[in-house]
Amino acid sequence: MSMSVDSLKLVSERQHLVDVLMSGKQYADILLKGGNVVNVITREIYPADVAVSGKYILMVGDCEALTGPDTTVYDMTGKYVMPGFVDCHMHFESAMLTMTEFSRLSIPTGTTCLISDPHEIGNVLGPVGIKEMAKEASHMPQHVFCRVPALTPDS
């Protein structure tokens, strides 16, 4: 059984993270120092640093040991650090905005992922419209996922 190229890349990225954390000789690329971390699972806000390597969070807590000479440090004193928001059910069509415009307006609110139910476009344009929405979604700065409507037209 062989692994896909994507799987091998993911294994390599994760191994790099382990190496950074365990070696004591490799450092984070970015350190968000002294911010107030919003933990959306425990509903707590607490002071902590956040260390980042590439596109991954390495550690939340005291990250001084992960700070090296090439680490970019941002002073987050008085600021809040939290995960991006996921809008888990929305209709671009109901907002009467294009996906691009909706994206432009929602990014400043911290929305990093949009999950669209395109049943209204499906009602009007069918599969062609849904495919066009998916094509536009591929150019958004946010992660955009288009669900397949269970029933079109909606009843």
Model-derived segments and their meaning:
Residues 1-2, 65:
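Short intrinsically disordered, low-complexity coil segments enriched in acidic
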Residues 2-21, 103-155:
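Divalent-metal coordination cores built from histidine and acidic residues
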Residues 8-31, 36-82:
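Histidine-rich, glycine-flanked metal-binding segment
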Residues 36, 54-56, 64, 90-92, ...:
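Short glycine-rich, polar/acidic loop-and-turn segments at beta strand-coil junctions
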Residues 50-58, 92-94, 104-107, 134-135:
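Short, low-complexity, polar/charged sequence segments that are solvent-exposed and flexible
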